[in-house]
Amino acid sequence: DQMNALVKAMDGEAGDLLLFAADRNKIVWNVLGALRVELADQMGLLDKSDYKFLWVTEFPQFEWSDEEERYVAMHHPFTMPMDEDLDMLETNPGAVRAKAYDIVLNGTEIGGGSVRIHQADVQSRMFKALGLTDEVANEKFGFLLDAFKYGVPPHAGLAYGLDRVVMLMVGADSIRDVIAFPKVKDASCL
């Protein structure tokens, strides 16, 4: 009865695969995402000759670290939060979105970037949201905070991974197949 109720609640039909996963969101999303891509590949659903681009935007500014028991910067502490989310820096950091973006080709990230913080008060608030005292922020990043006194124009950047584009263009399964001096996961040479 429970199984039938679950299938009905999910509008399941004959031939559907219903999966349940339990862990932290990041782990579940990564595992199920990898499974989805692997199944699509095995079932011949991926057309590797068709290039599909996607911009990913509005990343979370912070993610919770179970090890540190605090929010940490999702990318780095210099990414500008979305203007409409600035009021939540101190009260609800988990809901703050970043002015960050990735360009994805056929499911592979080929580039990423962000708008950088260009206001001293926002940078100070960001450091505080990350648990840095004014003293520690000045010790680590005083040069940056001082530079804001001279005026910083709004600026952004984007870095492409040409090696990843080449990997996709030649149909390689690993970036190590297309770079001159590939390393394995422990950073030793092949």
Residue spans of the language-model regions?
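Structured aminoacyl-transfer and RNA-binding surfaces used for tRNA recognition/handling
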Residues: 1-190
